[in-house]
Amino acid sequence: MEEQDPKTPSRPDREDSTTAEGSEQRLGHYLRMLSDENPGNRWKAADSLGRLKDPRGTGPLIDALFDDDVRVRVKVAWALGSIGDPRALGPLRQLYRMERQDQQEIIGEAIEAITRTMSGE
């Protein structure tokens, strides 16, 4: 069995993820990781929340949108676009105006994804 780095939060058991309780545990785990001191863990949390596409992640992701680490901010923007919740549009537009051009591209894609979701495309 692989030994876990004590600084990396453990991941919920994959077998549990098929049950409603397991899904709740996974969601809670990733939401807690969004505030981890390690930016790599915050990035992983945003990535996982974007893949889950659970709208309950929208509020915490919006809160994480202005993270100190640019890689985390961009991944959070991607996750919000993946979820497609229109509540993220205002904060994403604000972040878009603040970031450099290379980050603006990904943030713009997230805004477009949410706009498409809203229009039913």
Question: Which residues does each PLM region occupy?
Answer:
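Conserved hydrophobic register position within alpha-solenoid helical repeats
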Residues: 45, 76, 107-111
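Amphipathic alpha-helical scaffolding segments comprising HEAT/armadillo-like alpha-solenoid repeats
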Residues: 20-33, 54-66, 85-97, 117-121
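Long alpha-helical HEAT/HEAT-like repeat alpha-solenoid scaffolds in very large eukaryotic proteins
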Residues: 102-109, 113-118
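Short inter-helical turns and helix N-cap capping residues of alpha-solenoid HEAT/ARM repeat scaffolds
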Residues: 37-38, 68-69, 99-100, 104
